[in-house]
């Protein structure tokens, strides 16, 4: 049975830290599965017609997290989607009720790799106040146990390309679908 048939239209939610590659990997994965792609941050940006950093600055993180929950609630009512989520989506317990309607995949990227990827990024609102490595370390420490609740953890190295991550994900997904296949 093909992977698409075994998925039965279930959404695939990519979670992980900012800079993990959720958007890039998500687009590739959606294309390979014949699914549509949604980025929750892009939906929020389009809806509010301004960048996330401005939403954070003008309305605060709690208001952003509320928007994020509303978007996830709407997105989860659809099927055949690969969804790239914001890095903090796992912080709200209510969001897990939506995420568990599909398959949750944690793109687990080591701190050193995240720092290398995000060093030049000035758009991330949560990275504006402290040294990058210190702030990312704090965020990762606070979120890691939540990311670990994902159905599947995919460890990513500096050498991995979005294509190799997508390939590994497609190879690993059947291992967690029922009926189980030996992996």
Curated annotation (Swiss-Prot):
Binding, substrate: 41, 65, 87, 143
Q: How is the cofactor bound?
A: Binds 1 Mg(2+) ion per subunit.
Binding-site list for ATP:
19-24, 124
Major subcellular location class:
cytoplasm
**Taxonomy, superkingdom:** Bacteria
Q: What pathway is it annotated to?
A: Metabolic intermediate biosynthesis; chorismate biosynthesis; chorismate from D-erythrose 4-phosphate and phosphoenolpyruvate: step 5/7
Listed GO molecular functions? ATP binding; magnesium ion binding; shikimate kinase activity
| Job description of the protein | Catalyzes the specific phosphorylation of the 3-hydroxyl group of shikimic acid using ATP as a cosubstrate.
- What this protein is called in its record is Shikimate kinase
Q: Which gene encodes it?
A: aroK
């Amino acid at each position: 049975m093909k992977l698409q048939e075994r998925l039965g239209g279930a959404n695939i939610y990519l979670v992980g830290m900012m800079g993990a590659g959720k958007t890039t990997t998500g687009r590739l994965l959606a294309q390979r599965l014949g699914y549509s792609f949604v980025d929750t941050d892009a939906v929020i940006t389009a809806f509010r017609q301004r960048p996330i950093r401005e939403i954070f600055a003008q309305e605060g993180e709690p208001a952003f997290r509320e928007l994020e929950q509303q978007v996830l609630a709407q997105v989860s009512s659809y099927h055949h989607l690969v969804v790239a989520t914001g890095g903090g989506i796992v912080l709200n317990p209510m969001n897990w009720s939506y995420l568990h309607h599909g398959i949750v995949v944690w793109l687990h990227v080591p701190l050193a790799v995240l720092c290398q990827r995000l060093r030049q990024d000035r758009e991330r609102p949560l990275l504006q106040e402290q040294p990058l490595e210190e702030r990312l370390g704090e965020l990762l420490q606070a979120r890691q146990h939540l990311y670990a609740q994902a159905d599947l953890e995919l460890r990513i190295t500096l050498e991995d390309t979005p294509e190799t991550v997508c390939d590994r994900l497609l190879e690993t997904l059947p291992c967690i679908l029922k009926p189980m296949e030996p992996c």
